[in-house]
Amino acid sequence: MSGFSLSEYLTKFQTTDRESYPRLQDPSRELNVIIDQLAVSPEQIDASPDSLEALIDLCHDFPHLTPKLQTQLSYLISSSLSNLSKDIKANLSSNVNFTEIGGLIPQWKRHLEEYGYLIQVLLTFLQDELHKVSSQSTNLNRSAKNSKNDSANVELFKRDCNQMENLLESITKLLEINLSKIFQTTPEKDLFIGLFTRPLFVLLEIEPVTKVSSLKMFIQRILAMCVKNHGQSSSIQSSLMTNLTYFLHLSVFNAELLKLLNDEYNYPQLTEDILKEISTRVFNAKDTTGPKAISNFLIKLSELSPGIMLRQMNLVITLLNNSSITLRCSVVEACGNIVAELAQDPQTMEHYKQQIAVLIELLEERFQDSNPYVRTKAIQGCSKICDLSSKFNKSKAKFTSLAVRSLQDRSSLVRRNSVKLLSKLLLKHPFKAIHGSQLRLSEWEEYLKGSESQLNSTLKKVESQETLNDTIERSLIEEEVEQDEGQCRTELEGSFNKSAELSRIENEVENINATNTSVLMKLKLMIVYYKDAISFIKEIHKSIELISNLLFSKNRNEVLESMDFLVLADAFDIELSEFGIKKMLHLVWMKGTNDEGTSISVHLIECYKQLFLTAPDSCNMQEKAAHIAKNLINLSIGASIADLASLEQLLGMMYEQKLIDQHVINILWAIYNSASKASMQKEQNVNNRDSEKGFSKEQIHGSIIILGMLSLADNEIALKGLESLLNIGLGAVGLKDLTLCRYSCLALERMVPKRSTIITKAINQELEDVAVKKLYAIIINYTKDNEYYPMCEQALSALFTISSKPDILATDLIREKTMMTFGKPEEEDSILSLEQSSRVVSLSQLLFIVGQVAIKTLVYLEKCEAEFKKRKIEAETRNGKVKNQGADVTNTTQDNGGDKELEMIGGTNEDDFTDAIQFVKENELLFGEKSILGKFCPIVEEIVSNSSRFSDPMLQRTATLCLEKLMCLSSKYCEKSLPLLITVMEKSPDPTIRSNAVLGLGDMAVCFNNLVDENTDYLYRRLHDENLMVQRTCLMTVTFLILAGQVKVKGQLGEMAKCLDNPDQGISDMCRLFFTELASKDNAIYNGFIDIFSNLSSDDLLGKESFKKIIKFLLTFIDKERHQKQLNEKLVGRLRKCETQKQWDDIAFVLNNLPYKNEDVTALLEQGFKVVSAKE
């Protein structure tokens, strides 16, 4: 037996350089000797003076031992300690009388200290090696092996972990002993237990170790046993708090340890003490690790031990006053986690009912936190509560109103999470019990009306019953009073009988009252239920209006969430969802993806597929096709021009993805063909109510609109329905329904493929002749219906697309329409007769045709030019290939003979052809001897310049349009007629004419830039036209011209800037978009800022607040410091020359709002108006 002093050995080990320990000559032999000794009994560790020292030397030399010897040594010590612990525990538990084992305690103590020291030495060396390995390798705990070095490190890590597990297992056996019986004083016991806990806390600093589940389990169990059974709560608390402050990866570990302590060892005190300490801790402003680690810990603890955390929540909540956003976020998230965990069990929820209510209230308060991340955590906490099966109906109602309010938050993160919360609230709404899950407001209002009327009728019935009861009782009393005293016996008997009768009546009344009370209560509850539902639906309606505006957010994730919400709202049959879904249609033009790579347009297709291309499972193929066709038609009904353009793009994409099949197209054609049948029924039997109910006019229009859109993606669709188009749309039905005729013309035009040329024919000559004849007829047809003009425009477009000789046909058209308008009939039944019709209407139609033919001729000539260039390139390429291949003369002759046209092109100079086309446009179309268009120039000028004489509004509109289109043909005519058009744009009382004049001037700016550029001031004036439509038209026109580079931006940007504060939201939004786009073009805002500022500052009609609002917006685009500095210098120069207080104030406002600051400028501004007065 040797004298072993634990403190001495421990101090020596901690202060000695570990590399200085002597190497053993033959460690294997010495280890085998010790193994033999300890095999007899673990108490043989110090049987001889040399055995203990030999074992200690082996442990000190542990790093230099072979892997095999290391494993043997660690196993020997761990197994010996385990066996010793078992023996001691057995003796302590079996011997009740302490005096019997009192003599053994000093020996046990010495042996435990010896083994404890050896364990600590091994733990220290192992944790050093693990730390070294983990710092060298990146592949620990992973299957991938990037190199041989990593592979060796992984193997070493696993071996060390296995040895560590053996040692830790022996420690758990040791800690099962009641050490207080062996170590008489607390310092002795603490020193002994510290042999194990200190190395373990150092070991925990190695992150890969905490990912080995078996090691983590042993460490947590050891620490828990030390706390519970051996009074180490204070020291372990201190170590845990240190770890929490410096090591992020230990947040989850510590939370799991505290859960183990609470669940298996029934020791929640440590958790509570740690939470108390956290709540009072003050963090350094520069410290980011500490708050983050504490936050992760609180969040994990709230998930694992919500009950314990709830008890200390009053202290934890104080962290909400902390400046650290991370800590505030964690507290808010913890609140949500606690409620979510506790509310899963009904009994627990009932027990913590009040505390849960307080936490929910806290979450609601945090919706108004100053930081968006904290607000987001509050929203996410509410989302977790909404996922629960427990009913929080009152809370959900509050969540709904808060979420709707948060949709207007400045942070896109908050808005996106608000949309998610609303989706959950809608998905799990509590109003499904009686009338199903649908939430159509009109239906619920009807339910409420029904219940209220039922309640009123029930109340009246109850009142009438009460009155009857009072009457019966009163009559009985009166009869008793009037009884004669002489008839006492009879009276008593009668009284008895009457009392019995009265008792029976009272019982019936009580039953009736009980029934009435139950009915009344039920009705009142129903009314409350309906009112709550209606309130919820109205909140959802508000949210839809706001979410519809989020569809065009710059944040792609927000857009996708908004789309999904609108689809969900439609599934619940909420009326207003249609508004959002229609608005969603315009996202088809949006490019880009979200963080996960989801394309906006692809997601839009998925949404519309779910909404409109998915039929009930119970339907057969024909029914599904009909369902989809009707849905598509409904999309077109009531749609604006912008809606139809977006729908056309979307349907094209859907068709390309084969989401719309031939069955649907067949149904659409069937609906379109029903127009003929409906027309015949109407003519034959107008009042026959028994006739089969057909499709409405809107549905028939919708069918051909959709078919026209699909034909753009696949021209075969229109080609296959050509006969129907000619017989119905361009036949008798179309003549009576010009809208149907218009869209039929559009579909007819689209049977020509998009990539076709003017030479390629889409249909054979016979079908072309029929189609052209029909188009010709509907164009010259006289009607007073104003739908004629859009129909005529489409018909002429189709004519120029389909016909192989559109110029000749157009000439004939104009001649015949002219004869119809001005000519005299040769016969009474002549087709040209206009006996009962207005020549003014006919003239309006004629001028419209002339103008449209002028533009279409111009387009036709440009197509000819483009086709010439294309075929010339093809000819040159072909000839070059023939020469290179050395083809024989015979083949070359045959090729050239087969394509004489190409030969002609090959011999023509490209510039000559372009000049010829330009000559035709400039001189022949309007000024040629045989020019039919030129004949109308004087007529149009006369009508436009004499509006008092030709006062018909439609005639004036068509004449102005015609003038504009003729001006686009020739720069000569444009220059001549430009003053007339500007006069009309300035002075016409008709806003439609002024709008058309603005558009015409825009077109001319593209065609003849040099002519219009000098007169753009007149165009900019219309930005402040008294009519809103003219303002919008002008803003769109100028926006296009500037962004496309068609006009030079001079001093007119100031006029554009004034539109930023326009009362009309649409105009101000459009103007914002313009400046946003302009800012991306070569510092355009910076270059034009001084001119804009001068314009705004000198405008006395512009309010002070409006000026500030506009300037603030524009300054956001000047973000380069160099530009800010230069602008600052320019404005300071102006500041010194100011003559009025207003000028000085305006410049000072800009300088104060510029991010660039200068001390001289600040001093100058502080002097204020003194500078001005000195000048004066």
UniProtKB/Swiss-Prot annotation:
It is found in: Nucleus; Chromosome. The keyword Repeat applies. The modification Phosphoserine is found at residues 464, 475. Gene3D superfamilies: Leucine-rich Repeat Variant. GO terms for molecular function: histone binding. It comes from the Eukaryota. The keyword Nucleus applies. One of its GO terms (cellular component) is nucleolus. Keywords: Cell cycle, Cell division, Chromosome, DNA condensation, Mitosis, Nucleus, Phosphoprotein, Repeat. GO terms for biological process: cell division; chromosome condensation; maintenance of rDNA; meiotic chromosome condensation; meiotic chromosome separation; mitotic chromosome condensation; mitotic sister chromatid segregation; negative regulation of meiotic DNA double-strand break formation. Pfam families: Cnd1, Cnd1_N. Belongs to the CND1 (condensin subunit 1) family. Present with 2540 molecules/cell in log phase SD medium. Component of the condensin complex, which contains the SMC2 and SMC4 heterodimer, and three non SMC subunits that probably regulate the complex: BRN1, YCS4 and YCG1/YCS5. Regulatory subunit of the condensin complex, a complex required for conversion of interphase chromatin into mitotic-like condense chromosomes. The condensin complex probably introduces positive supercoils into relaxed DNA in the presence of type I topoisomerases and converts nicked DNA into positive knotted forms in the presence of type II topoisomerases. The condensin complex probably also plays a role during interphase. This is Condensin complex subunit 1. It comes from Saccharomyces cerevisiae (strain ATCC 204508 / S288c).
